[in-house]
Amino acid sequence: MKRLYWSHISMVRKCPLRYLWYKGHPDHDLGAGLGKPKPLAFEERPSEHFKLMGSVLSKVVEVMYNDRLLEKPKDCLSKLTEVAQQEFEKLEQTHHIMWTYLTREEAMKICLDGVRNFLEIVKDHRMISKSYAQSELSMTPQINKSLKVCGIADLVYRDLDGKLWILDGKNASTPMKYEDEDQLRWYALCFRLEYGVLPDKLGFFYFRYPKSNPPKKNPDPSSEWTGLVEVSLTEDDIRRLGNEAIETHRIIERGVFEANPVPKNCSFCEFENICEARQEQKRLNAAKRKPKEPKEYDNYKTFTLGSGKL
């Protein structure tokens, strides 16, 4: 039985060809054998420092909730700081990192600050439970006879008022600029199919920006920044994503993947430099731009050189 994750949906939405190159397909040999992803030369591989930091902070959330550290709140900061340091040192051995965008020390600081900020968000929003809390919750329900829709939620918990939440933590520097709210709705779809109920609340929380350190640009200027952004959910969202899952599976099974170059998406794609469609688009865009006209100088004007005049 085939499995479909949110990352599959998101990639096929934005660019089917990137999905093919990133995931591979049994009908295609992209240079490494049938079914294998397209290989990239070492110099073309993007740095995974953002992925590294995100994985470290996800581990922090997982340990805090699954190991029930909230039962001893005084020890949380020291234990989670240790978890972050150890996870960082472990993962940097397996990730392709180029310390050019930021230094190793800066990345470590972002993670350690993220621990402290996360605890502040937990306190401010009372993200505690006396009945149910699970981090890295894996869901793999069937949506039809041939397909499972899958998701791994950062945090699912029932709050002290009885409301069921699904939350996703983000290490983004610009909240809600690149997040897709359908990611959380996808997890809600998976949860409904797995457990028979919809969550009451969905939201993103931001490791860099607790209430005490708001971002420069609040995605909702009409309200105070709190470190958590709620996302709406309706039955129509669930039906829409269920239908999209089935259609996306059909597209993948058909095995025809066309490029869909869009600059804002291509800028995050590791294959941008080798994608013919994107390079052709860039050439056409460059040709449309008017060439800069050379500046003409009036020989009779006065030019200033240093403190003297000619």
Describe each model-derived feature in a short phrase:
Residues 49, 53, 107, 111, ...:
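Hydrophobic (often cysteine-bearing) scaffold residues that line and stabilize catalytic clefts
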